[in-house]
């Protein structure tokens, strides 16, 4: 039997309710109360931790990310600091010179919106060829929805002047009618598979690296889509199941498993859905409807304000999308669909309503839910559709959303507080590695709606700023609700999992600008201390 008593603390129980201490026993919260009550209940055999007045919150539960890719990114070329394509070429050449055994160059860290004003352009196959023509080169945009690749990858994909169609994707052509090496959506996803695949041992190493970083920053659950993202599902499954069977993974894991077509949907339900190994389980089916705002591949009903001819990429035909949603509904499987643009959100939530009515008993979810108008938000509430927000996206998006969407639509988007006030179940995640998976940085964005430089001074559309308590609830209780675990996860109450974080500063009373710099001093998962500063 393991027992731990935390005392002399500020324990967040629920909105407006705090305690001084708690007792966990064998992975469950046994009691919450005063320091005296807990110490008298703990007994001689409990580990007793004096928190020195520090704040304790439930463990953060990232409701959508890609944790395998986070680990990969820690080992791969980082061009996030490059301010031109030419700098990326130089960085790529340097990386290969330092890593002569590299069999395929992969990165997903550049952002053209951060390029120097006189050097803003997208890379193409010629730029990638300038890095190497001997091995596959994949330069992915930070959003994960577009990429430049070299001629070798185009050749491996069989793309040329006469063959340049990929269902659910776009292959950009140059003036000569040949693919210029820039790919969107399903086309860039297929190109990733041309990079030599990781082994099971590679995947296990990447998982553990990313999870170590996660628990050091207070994450205790990851709801992650890794299924076929950067490795075949067989590799992903074997790595995960071996880690969790051996008890080596330090956090809980819920698989949001990508299904791009009906065949994959049938295979997922037949082979994996609902299966558990230790602290991991296979959960929702993840679908994709559109792309990203930054790459202008998010589906916009009326096009982009700064590019009216662009309306985004529809990644799945409506008849196939509806058939898959209906299939999952019939099997009792939660569907979580990537939708960023208002066009994607509108189509998808109407399909949810068509198959699930207003009850939505399987809690189908829209991931991202960025560009909306109030009629769409009301529809979401009326049909009990769940939302997974990534407030940390505002670090970048607050600088581009009005130019992409126009002022009026932008002011109805990223509507965190409105969704809360309407009673929509909205959870928080990071979509990492698109953004850092640090929960405190994410909370900062939800509460202040500013970038890390504190701009704009009043916050972007400050009417949608969240209170700290509501933001913490979205990151804990609501994330648990999305996985049907709200009765055992996301609160520090008797009968709940002993997943918690001790913070070095009181996020409920400190200057909101300081939240992003707050750090955990201890993280507990399932009653076990997995990180201690």
List each model region and its residues.
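His/Asp/Glu-enriched, well-ordered alpha-helical/loop segment
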Residues: 326-336, 343-364, 369, 374-378, ...
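Non-cysteine beta-strand/loop elements that form the S-adenosyl-L-methionine
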Residues: 66, 279-297, 385-395
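Acidic (Asp/Glu)-rich catalytic clusters
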Residues: 244-247, 271-277, 359, 380-384
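Generic beta-strand/beta-sheet core signal
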Residues: 32, 140, 224-225, 254-258, ...
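Divalent metal-binding segments
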Residues: 3-7, 15-17, 23-268, 292-327, ...
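Short aromatic-centered micro-motifs
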Residues: 23, 287, 523
């Amino acid at each position: 039997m393991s027992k731990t008593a935390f005392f002399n603390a500020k324990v967040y129980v629920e909105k407006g309710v705090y305690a001084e201490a708690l007792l966990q026993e064998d992975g469950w919260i046994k009691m919450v109360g005063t320091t005296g009550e807990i110490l008298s209940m703990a007994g001689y055999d409990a580990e007793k931790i004096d928190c020195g007045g520090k704040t304790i919150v439930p463990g953060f539960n990232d409701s959508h990310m890609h944790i395998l890719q986070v680990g990969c990114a820690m080992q791969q070329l980082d061009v996030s600091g490059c301010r031109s394509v030419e700098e990326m070429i130089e960085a790529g050449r340097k990386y290969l010179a330092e890593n002569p055994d590299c069999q395929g160059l992969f990165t997903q860290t550049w952002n053209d919106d951060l390029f120097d004003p006189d050097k803003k352009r997208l890379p193409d196959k010629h730029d990638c060829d300038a890095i190497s023509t001997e091995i596959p080169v994949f330069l992915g945009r930070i959003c994960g929805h577009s990429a430049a690749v070299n001629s070798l990858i185009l050749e491996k994909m069989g793309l040329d002047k006469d063959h340049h169609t990929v269902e659910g994707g776009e292959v950009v052509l140059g003036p000569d009618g040949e693919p210029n090496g820039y790919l969107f959506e399903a086309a860039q996803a297929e190109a990733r598979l041309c990079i030599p695949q990781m082994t099971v041992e590679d995947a296990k190493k990447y998982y553990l690296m990313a999870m170590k970083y996660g628990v050091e920053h207070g994450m205790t659950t990851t709801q992650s889509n890794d299924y076929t993202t950067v490795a075949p599902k067989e590799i992903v499954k074997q790595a995960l199941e071996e880690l969790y069977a051996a008890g080596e993974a330090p956090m809980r894991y819920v698989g949001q498993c990508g299904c791009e077509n009906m065949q994959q949907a049938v295979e997922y339900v037949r082979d994996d859905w609902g299966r558990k190994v230790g602290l991991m389980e296979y959960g929702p089916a993840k679908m994709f409807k559109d792309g990203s705002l930054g790459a202008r591949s998010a589906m916009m009903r009326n096009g982009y304000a700064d590019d009216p001819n662009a309306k985004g990429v529809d990644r799945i035909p409506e008849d196939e999308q509806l058939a898959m949603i209906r299939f999952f509904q019939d099997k009792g499987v939660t569907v979580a669909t990537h939708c960023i643009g208002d066009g994607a959100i509108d189509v998808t939530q109407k399909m949810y309503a068509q198959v699930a009515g207003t009850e939505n008993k399987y809690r189908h979810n829209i991931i991202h839910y960025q560009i909306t108008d109030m009629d769409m938000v009301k529809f979401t509430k009326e049909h009990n559709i769940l939302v997974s927000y990534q407030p940390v996206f505002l670090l970048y998006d607050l600088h581009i959303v009005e130019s992409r969407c126009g002022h009026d639509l932008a002011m109805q988007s990223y509507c965190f507080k409105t969704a809360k006030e309407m009673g929509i179940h909205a959870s928080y995640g990071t979509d990492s590695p698109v953004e850092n998976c640090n929960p405190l940085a994410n909370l900062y964005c939800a509460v202040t709606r500013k970038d890390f430089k504190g701009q704009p001074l009043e916050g972007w559309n400050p009417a949608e700023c969240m209170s700290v308590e509501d933001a913490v609830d979205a990151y804990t209780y609501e994330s648990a609700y999305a996985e049907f675990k709200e009765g055992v996860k996301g609160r520090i109450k008797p009968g709940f999992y002993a997943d918690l974080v001790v913070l070095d500063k009181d996020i409920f009373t400190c200057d909101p600008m300081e939240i992003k710099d707050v750090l955990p001093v201890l993280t507990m998962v399932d009653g076990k201390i997995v990180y201690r500063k």
